[in-house]
Amino acid sequence: MAIISSLANQLLIAMPSLKDPNFERSVVYLCEHNEQGSVGLIINRPLQFPLSIVFEQLQIEPIRVEKNGLPLLFGGPVQPERGFVIHKQMGGWRSSLFLQDEVTVTTSNDIIRAIAYDEGPKDVLITLGYAAWTEQQLEREIMSNTWLVCPYKSEILYEVPFEERWEYAGLTLGIKMNQLSSDAGHA
């Protein structure tokens, strides 16, 4: 099977037929996609605990109490103890990967401290864990109608409420997700 042209910096939308609890109704930002596989972060699955838990673990006292309420997101089932901060490019963080004009992923604690002290990026998502696919696995899943591919839209990543992202991403493709059949077919 030939590799689909790179899907890096695009979004995956879970089809209604995907019932895996890790990915059901998920929207995934693809950070990397190449011959070796793919890596992405789920951007619409808030966890049951806020950022204050991370502040406590790192012994950080935020200067603004509302920072405690920032949600943590389930980024995927791989290494769920590992944090990833998705943000617009700014600052010189110790461990950042620039992906495109509006998306940088940082994994170092210095950005968490900056967020706590109101010196970090304004538009930010903080995820725990990530999603990964082996060589050709994502291509096979796309071909079997497990995922839709959606071009990156800044508003999906930073503005649309979490609970609306799945449906909204589909609408950007002209698709009402709740009207799709879970039965797949090929013409």
UniProtKB/Swiss-Prot annotation:
Transmembrane segments: none
Pfam families assigned to the protein according to its UniProt record, in alphabetical order: DUF179 (PF02622)
Gene Ontology CC annotation, any one: cytosol
SUPFAM superfamilies for this protein: VC0467-like
Domain of life: Bacteria
Classification via NCBIfam families: PRK00228.1-1
Family recorded in the similarity comment: Belongs to the UPF0301 (AlgH) family.
Protein name: UPF0301 protein lpl0620
